[in-house]
Curated annotation (Swiss-Prot):
Alphabetical list of NCBIfam families matching this protein: Fibro_Slime (TIGR02148)
InterPro entries listed in its UniProt record: Fibro_Slime (IPR011874), PA14/GLEYA (IPR037524), PA14_dom (IPR011658), Prespore-cell_inducing_factor (IPR051154), S_mold_repeat (IPR001673)
Family affiliation: Belongs to the prespore-cell-inducing factor family.
Protein name, UniProt field: Protein psiC
GO cellular component terms attached to this protein's record: extracellular region
Keyword set, alphabetical order: Glycoprotein, Secreted, Signal
Composition bias type Pro residues, residue spans: 449-460
Residue ranges annotated for the PA14 domain, each copy included: 109-249
Region (Disordered): 418-465
Superkingdom assignment: Eukaryota
Signal peptide: 1-19
Coiled coil feature spans: none
Pfam families, sorted: Dicty_CTDC, PA14
């Protein structure tokens, strides 16, 4: 009689176990992206199931243990997983790499076969618009083929073995299912839909005892996402975390409590220390660079722009040194104006500010004239040079100052009858020829000095700008650069007598503009 009563309650208990219309499995989905993890959307990925990518026993943290440390997993010479570092984010939340999102996977009892629970989807996209796919928080994130194709999902649960149970999975990509911490479904790799079934009667389990069930799934590549489950296991949860996830790690609490904000200048902490509530604080946008200004835009987030080192001095070169900060280097041959800096390129034509317009510069030829008709003057490299061009004759007194080479005359008119001619003298005989003869008298003035440039055209009554010479290089100074007409002056060109096009190197110009 006792045996009959026990059998009755056992059968009743089994029937009660399988009378529910659905099984809800709390899951954690870790959103990923190819830009953050190269294991996702691998180019030319092999279409094949790759076994032994994870160890056969579940890890101590209740996630699969990667097989190969820092080494990658290859199939036919192509990456399938890059390393332990890239694998870590598949089933763990790593800031900026993976994003934990809670999810409920609901298996529905079959109408035709009571006690059989089914989930079927050939378009499994559970987090479209969530995680990194949230365009409000991540407006620049790429959407692949209209869906979020890159994520991993884990489910922790348990079951009581009654005998006769089985579990069938079909889908893509990676799937690992552990029964009692042992890997029994191994469908790793990037592949189209693949399937496998586990019959629990073959596992040597004890009837009436409970065992852990751990399910891991990844979608890593477009263009398919299939997930299909058929089972008569009565999966239940023995413990939930603070966020309502079965055997979870509290890593979805921030998502549950809506810590997301459109204010990109705020950050939120959500952990045990905040009792899993959102604690907001201002984001630190400092990039540690003294050559940048740090700021934050509510819609964009941190903005780090180059610092402005302009000191308002047009005659300094301003830049930022990563060690010393802003530096200001003086520009050679520069005269500062109110609105610009005037830089002299040709030393004999110094550029200065226009006295009538502080936003313009004018170039003028250096004045080397000494008002002496017997000297020829010329500017060479910014210095005036002088050449004696008159004869060294005695005037009315017949006396020549040999120290200066200048004739000393006390009268305005030279009388030829007063000239004393000494044939033994080295002083040449004066001549009334209109062309002066070169002097043989020694002098300290330089010889063989080039003649000054030919004079520009005589100005007309109204100022004008003369046309550029055809052989004037575009990089040379032009009349349009001087602004002569603004001061009531014309602008013409002085020919460079030393100009030889074939021998030119840098700063070589056939003509030089000047105001007159």
């Amino acid at each position: 009689m006792k045996i009959l009563i026990l059998s009755f309650f056992l059968i009743l208990g089994i029937n009660l176990v399988f009378c529910q219309s659905s099984i809800s499995l709390s899951a954690t989905i870790y959103d990923q992206s190819p830009a953050r993890n190269p294991d996702f959307e691998i180019p030319n990925a092999p279409n094949a199931v790759v076994k032994n990518m994870v160890l056969s026993t579940l890890g101590a943290d209740k996630t699969p243990t990667y097989c190969c440390g820092d080494n990658g997993v290859y199939y036919n010479g192509q990456f399938d997983i890059h390393s332990q570092s890239t694998f870590d984010s598949w089933f763990h939340e790593i800031e900026g790499i993976s994003y934990a999102v809670p999810y409920e996977l609901v298996l529905i009892e079959s109408k035709d076969e009571p006690g059989i629970y089914v989930y079927t989807s050939s378009s499994f996209f559970p987090i479209d618009g969530k995680g990194f796919d949230n365009k409000t928080l991540y407006p620049d994130e790429i959407t692949y083929n209209g869906h979020n194709y890159h994520f991993c999902m884990k489910i922790h649960s348990s079951f009581t073995y009654h005998g006769g149970e089985y579990f069938t999975f079909a889908g893509d990509d990676d799937v690992w299912v552990y029964f009692d911490n042992n890997l029994l479904i191994d469908l790793g790799g990037l592949h189209t839909s693949a399937s496998e079934t586990v019959y629990l009667d073959n596992l040597g389990l004890t009837i009436g005892q409970s065992f852990p069930f751990d399910f891991f799934y990844c979608e890593r590549h477009t263009y398919e996402s299939n997930l299909n489950i058929i089972t008569n296991l009565n999966l239940t949860c023995i413990e939930y975390d603070a966020c309502g996830v079965c055997l979870g790690k509290n890593d979805t609490c921030c998502f549950v409590n809506k810590c997301e904000t459109i204010n990109r200048c705020l950050e939120a902490d959500c952990n045990e220390g905040t009792n899993f509530q959102c604690d907001y604080h201002i984001k630190n946008c400092s990039d540690g660079d003294i050559c940048s200004t740090d700021g934050c835009d509510i819609g964009f987030g941190c903005i780090n722009l180059p610092i402005n080192c302009d000191d308002g001095n047009y005659c300094t070169k301003d830049y930022c040194d990563p060690t010393y900060g802003c530096l200001h280097i003086e520009t050679a041959n520069c005269t500062e104006c109110l609105e610009t800096g005037c830089i002299t390129v040709l030393p004999c034509f110094p550029v200065t500010c226009d006295s009538l317009n502080s936003s313009h510069c004018v170039a003028s030829a250096m004045n080397c004239s000494d008002n002496d008709p017997c000297t020829s003057t010329e500017c060479v490299n910014g210095e005036c040079t002088y050449e004696w061009i008159c004869g060294s004759e005695d005037s009315s007194s017949g006396v020549v100052d040999s120290s200066s080479g200048v004739v000393d005359s006390s009268s305005d008119v030279i009388d030829s009858s007063d000239i004393i001619i000494d044939s033994s003298s080295d002083i040449p005989i004066p001549t009334l020829s209109p062309s002066p003869q070169p002097s043989r008298f020694p002098t300290d003035t330089p010889t063989n000095t080039p003649m000054p440039p030919t004079r520009p055209p005589t100005p007309t009554e109204d100022p004008k700008i003369y046309e550029d010479p055809e052989d004037l290089d575009k990089d040379c100074l032009h009349c349009k650069d001087l602004g002569c007409i603004l001061t009531g002056k014309s602008c013409g060109y002085l020919k460079n007598e030393k100009y030889e096009k074939s021998n030119c190197k840098e700063n070589c110009c056939s003509h030089t503009p000047t105001c007159f």
